Amino acid sequence: MNRTFSLRRKVKKSEISTPSNFEHRIHAGFDARSGTYTGLPKQWQALLGPPRSISRPKPMVDPSCITPVDVAELKTVIRGPSSSFRYNSPLPFGMTNSPMPSVARSNSLRISATASPVVNVSSARHSFRPTLPPVSQRGYPFNDPSYAPLPLRNQKPPMSTTFGVEKPHQYQQIITIVAPSRTTTPQLQPKSPSTPQAMRQQPKCTEGVSDEEFRNALKFVVDGTDPRSDLTDYKQIGEGSTGVVEAAYKISTKQIVAVKRMNLRKQQRRELLFNEVSILRQYQHPNIVRFFSSHLVDDELWVVMEFMEGGSLTDIVTATRMTEPQIATISRQVLGALDFLHARKVIHRDIKSDSILLKRDGTVKLTDFGFCGQLSEEVPRRRSLVGTPYWTAAEVIAREPYDTRADIWSFGIMLIEMVEGEPPFFNDQPFQAMKRIRDEHEARFSRHAKVSVELSELLSHCIVKDVNKRWPAKDLLRHPFFAKAQHSSSIAPLLLQLQGNTINGNNPPTHHHSSQITTVIQ
């Protein structure tokens, strides 16, 4: 025994050599200015997802108060780096020999974050949830245990609402087939903060229609032709939770078009597909993005629309400084589209710079109609909480009945965007911003903003909590400020300046805020 121990003590440990031919290929760092990691391998960066500062706030739907006729769910705003959209070519004012001229993001051509940011909400808040499908099937923000709707003041039971229109249209009848109205709105009762386990135990709602029934209903609002024979040279320029967006060359008209491709079987709420298609199909206006056609291709819905090569207004407000004549020129066109919609009792409910697209000649057009609401004599106001928090009207956040003038509040916030580069309270988390919008005084231009008396007065007619004092779009168009408006071509220098920043490697600056999540509340 002793001999054995002595032998063990004499055994020499093998020496481990130092590393040889060592190469340090990864040099990770942290950029404090942008709040992002640098030098990470692509696989690691994919796990982290894109930084919050790249993503614009993304609409989300509050399930606690949904009018039965409203079909608005979580909408992914497709958005991406400006350098990825332009086919690596300059922005000419004339067509080139190539069938694919230089283009910028357009018509919801915005790439969304692959990993949705988490809304930071105190777990002490109560959660109000009606009978809805399990959160595991509904995705962000519903499967986030920290998510809860905004607490209300003097909450009253929601009124039951039925859908009615003055002049029924075919698409509205189809929507009734797909998403039949309930006679009463579910009563909302407070619950303790939900844990992931409790959320998984929620009862499951049965689907109203089968895949085949939905497909048959959708055939009433789409063209019966196959668009693939007339489209070529596809180039994916966007991707979101509803599908992908591609630029394509339309052979018959020899033009670039935007094609949204949405898989019917992968939609969290398929009936939402009716909303944008129906609005674009029915309403044509010089300042509304042009709709060409929609098609059922296998299990996908294809929507072919005008390609807006100038990009979104967001690119301009974050990268350039606009003059008041340029602000007036853009605002006049936006109000023209709103006046057209409001005269037809349509509420857009998501007015912001992301929803405003431009042509290369400076023409401004309104897009993103997935959250529209239709009013009628039977339903003169809506109650559903819909909108992007920083732009949402105070009465919408307070869940009071609202009408088309809710869009005017959002338009006023967009005026502040064009002057200051971002909406008020953008440093706050979405729900904190909503509380401030609801409880504090109306937002105004900052003291450092050098604006004219006319522009300040215009803003005061838009952002006012007394809805009766808020001017409609047709009255705003007659405001003295719009005497400064010029021809749409006056916007072209902004697009050239934006293009120059991209060519020189200076991408348009993004808002570096932790609250870079867009929150839309329905």
From Swiss-Prot:
For this UniProt record, the keywords arranged alphabetically read as follows: ATP-binding, Kinase, Magnesium, Manganese, Metal-binding, Nucleotide-binding, Serine/threonine-protein kinase, Transferase
Which residue windows are coiled coil? Answer: none
Domain Protein kinase span(s) in chain numbering:
231-482
Tissue distribution: Expressed in pharynx, vulva and spermatheca. Unlike other p21-activated kinases, expression is not detected in neurons.
Q: What does the record give as the reaction this protein catalyses?
A: L-seryl-[protein] + ATP = O-phospho-L-seryl-[protein] + ADP + H(+); L-threonyl-[protein] + ATP = O-phospho-L-threonyl-[protein] + ADP + H(+)
A Gene Ontology cellular-component term = cytoplasm
Q: What does this protein do?
A: Serine/threonine-protein kinase which plays a redundant role with pak-1 in embryogenesis but, in contrast to pak-1, is not involved in commissural axon guidance of ventral cord motoneurons or in distal tip cell (DTC) migration.
Organism, as annotated: Caenorhabditis elegans
GO molecular function of the protein, one example?
Answer: ATP binding
Its recorded name reads Serine/threonine-protein kinase pak-2
